[in-house]
UniProtKB/Swiss-Prot annotation:
Organism: Sorghum bicolor
Subcellular location: Nucleus, Nucleolus; Nucleus, Nucleoplasm; Mitochondrion
A GO BP entry: DNA replication, removal of RNA primer
Protein purpose: Structure-specific nuclease with 5'-flap endonuclease and 5'-3' exonuclease activities involved in DNA replication and repair. During DNA replication, cleaves the 5'-overhanging flap structure that is generated by displacement synthesis when DNA polymerase encounters the 5'-end of a downstream Okazaki fragment. It enters the flap from the 5'-end and then tracks to cleave the flap base, leaving a nick for ligation. Also involved in the long patch base excision repair (LP-BER) pathway, by cleaving within the apurinic/apyrimidinic (AP) site-terminated flap.
Gene3D superfamilies the UniProt entry points to: 5' to 3' exonuclease, C-terminal subdomain (1.10.150.20), 5'-nuclease (3.40.50.1010)
Name listed for the protein in its UniProt record: Flap endonuclease 1-A
Record-listed DNA binding positions: R71, E159, G232, D234
Keywords: DNA damage, DNA repair, DNA replication, Endonuclease, Exonuclease, Hydrolase, Magnesium, Metal-binding, Mitochondrion, Nuclease, Nucleus, Phosphoprotein
Amino acid sequence: MGIKGLTKLLADNAPKAMKEQKFESYFGRKIAIDASMSIYQFLIVVGRTGMETLTNEAGEVTSHLQGMFNRTIRLLEAGIKPVYVFDGKPPDMKKEELAKRFSKREDATNDLKEAVEAGDKDAVEKLSKRTVKVTAQHNDDCKRLLRLMGVPVVEAPSEAEAECAALCKNDKVFAVASEDMDSLTFGAPRFLRHLMDPSSKKIPVMEFDVAKVLEELELTMDQFIDLCILCGCDYCDSIKGIGGQTALKLIRQHGSIESILENLNKDRYQIPEDWPYQEARRLFKEPNVTLDVPELKWTPPDEEGLISFLVKDNGFNEDRVTKAIEKIKSAKNKSSQGRLESFFKPVATTSAPLKRKETSDKTSKAAAANKKTKAGGKKK
């Protein structure tokens, strides 16, 4: 679920903290990617028609492999250096949310059977997507694929979003990419949405800057975490009747959930019984993450390994895979060359060129005015 309604809340109240970027603008950047979220998107979108999905000869789904392979190549061709982060064991506080998701999938599965029997194609299309679940096998398949491609894989001890945020805070990567907004709540300095969008449409990447988010909302990081808990997160229920705008107003007015609870109209708002908001806050502030991450390395692809895994084991077209491997090799050479050039060339700050240009403009205008004065207004 992520943080309920946070994107709209930020668009309405902190628009300067968000900006659209071209995919290619992240050339040379290391990006930590929430792998499970990406796999889920691929399973829903790639090669799906109604209930039918891409499979190998054994009938095993391969949509996740097709999506991960193609998207990663596109990232590499754009000069982006992806790091895929996989979920570990979820926190105990997430069990209730996971149970809700399981129940929803069960309901969708039952509704899907009825839709199939009724021949309702639209309902089948919609409900089949709701039954999708990322399995351990899907994760293992993608880890193997990425390692064969020479792309680093990080296995988080717990939440992938928290691990991604930690990598970003420790300057191991430039930004975090996911569709769930949790990474901002975990304190990722830069967060990207739509980087991994699997649709054919070229959707711009939306970049969020957490420092600007706090500045625009006029909140501290602790207050922002409390705001996210009030909006609704994966770790506990929220207070019914309090949406994003009301939550923001209350946090600005009272400063913390404790103070809000002391002043809240109990007749109007029902506070969840034994509400574990403090534990949720602790999970956002002190998540279980890897303290000493090994050096992230991008290596040449294992050509034989890729052909064996994709072509022999999963029925991919050998000619296409061979061409894709050449793309990977070419992209990695291009990305490496770009890094070397940026290393040897001095990079000016963003403000410096603007100041120089402004000075240059003023000088030009002054020279033009001086020339006009000397000309004495003579007509030609």
